[in-house]
């Protein structure tokens, strides 16, 4: 699978731009603020139906304009496909495949397997548990549409249950029968999501460990630890036990929406005890493991986006990535960098075909 062409209209800082891509390596070089990352983000947008860097869709429209369009042609399974994502102010975003609009964006997730490695990934370490849950969910959802559906349904029920708890508080009333209906639904969806997260991590963690060892070449011990209330008790029991707490807080305090994926080094939080270099290695290993997991499960090499990562890597880690490109581990690769000479030297050393776009 690879992208052939990309056209942008009023997307972020681009009024209009078009690119014809190499099937292997494509580099976007230029000064900071010129739009290199925005091209990568447009490609991400096509895969996930949203920006990696700005979740507020309307803010991706070029300042002073009324709409944006991202239009791409790609080859997948020997077929040419057209994907178009567009948004007009005041209207819903539209995502089309070969001219036909998706009824639900979730039906598109997984059609373009894609992994991004970016300085923004540091949020996975420094931000709260929601960021790490989203990482888990995005990987699983690209391969399992049932999981994504269950996740969406679970989140809807959480919103409804929380609204009911607020209603009880405002009206000084309580109806356990109605609450029990939501509890049963959460238990049904939550149990399945919990089991699938466990299954995913059982396979993912060994892949992560291999990549971390390859990148660092060191003996330091790193861990991904899944934390969930459901290891202790089933969700129905937890919801019943915490009812007084939930009524006081006006929201649901236990469930898979509180899960976390703890990042550790030598059994301590890497956020506090890992150096910058150790944190970078951890995140790159995490994303390369995501790439390998998706490739293994789908049989398709995901598109890989490297956003400004050479600034953050020493020569040893760059050499490791070059080695992986040469081994045909990767499929199509998109790179952004501020240093044209460095970029060209790196891609030349891979002995693969490439294009460099000076923005």
From Swiss-Prot:
Q: Name one Pfam family in it.
A: SMC_N
Give the signal peptide as a residue range, or say none if absent: none
Alphabetized GO MF terms? ATP binding; single-stranded DNA binding
Give the location in the cell.
Cytoplasm
Keyword DNA damage appears in the UniProt entry: yes
| UniProt family annotation | Belongs to the RecF family.
Task of the protein: The RecF protein is involved in DNA metabolism; it is required for DNA replication and normal SOS inducibility. RecF binds preferentially to single-stranded, linear DNA. It also seems to bind ATP.
Q: What is this protein called?
A: DNA replication and repair protein RecF
The organism of origin for this protein: Flavobacterium johnsoniae (strain ATCC 17061 / DSM 2064 / JCM 8514 / BCRC 14874 / CCUG 350202 / NBRC 14942 / NCIMB 11054 / UW101)
């Amino acid at each position: 699978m690879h992208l052939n062409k990309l056209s942008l209209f009023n997307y972020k800082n681009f009024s209009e731009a078009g690119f014809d891509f190499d099937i292997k390596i494509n580099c976007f070089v230029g000064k900071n603020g010129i739009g290199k990352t925005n091209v990568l983000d447009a490609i991400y947008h096509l895969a996930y139906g949203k920006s990696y860097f700005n979740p507020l869709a309307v803010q991706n429209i070029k300042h002073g304009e009324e709409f944006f369009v991202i239009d791409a042609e790609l080859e997948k399974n020997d077929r040419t496909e057209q994907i178009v994502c567009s948004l007009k102010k005041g209207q819903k975003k539209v995502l089309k495949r070969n001219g036909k609009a998706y009824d639900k964006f979730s039906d598109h997730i997984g059609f373009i397997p894609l992994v991004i490695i970016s300085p923004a990934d540091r949020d996975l370490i420094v931000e709260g548990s929601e960021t790490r849950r989203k990482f888990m969910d995005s990987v699983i959802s690209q391969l399992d549409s049932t999981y994504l559906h269950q996740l969406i349904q679970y989140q809807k029920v959480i919103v409804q249950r929380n609204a009911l708890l607020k209603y009880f508080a405002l009206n000084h009333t309580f109806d356990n029968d109605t609450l029990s209906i939501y509890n049963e639904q959460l238990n049904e969806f939550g149990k399945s999501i919990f089991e699938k997260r466990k299954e995913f991590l059982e396979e993912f963690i060994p892949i992560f460990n291999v990549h971390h060892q390859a990148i660092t070449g060191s003996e330091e011990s790193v861990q991904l630890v899944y934390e969930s209330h459901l290891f202790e008790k089933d969700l129905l029991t937890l919801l019943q036990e915490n009812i007084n707490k939930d009524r006081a807080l006006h929201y649901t305090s236990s469930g898979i929406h509180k899960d976390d994926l703890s990042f550790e080094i030598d059994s301590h939080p890497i956020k506090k005890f890992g150096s910058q270099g150790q944190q970078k290695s951890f995140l790159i290993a995490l994303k390369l493991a995501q790439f390998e997991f998706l490739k293994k499960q789908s049989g398709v090499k995901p598109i890989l986006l490297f956003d400004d990562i050479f600034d953050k890597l020493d020569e040893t880690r760059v050499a490791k990535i070059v080695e992986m490109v040469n081994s045909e581990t990767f499929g199509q690769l998109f790179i952004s960098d501020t240093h044209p000479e460095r970029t060209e030297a790196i891609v030349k050393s891979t002995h693969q075909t490439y294009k460099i776009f000076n923005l």
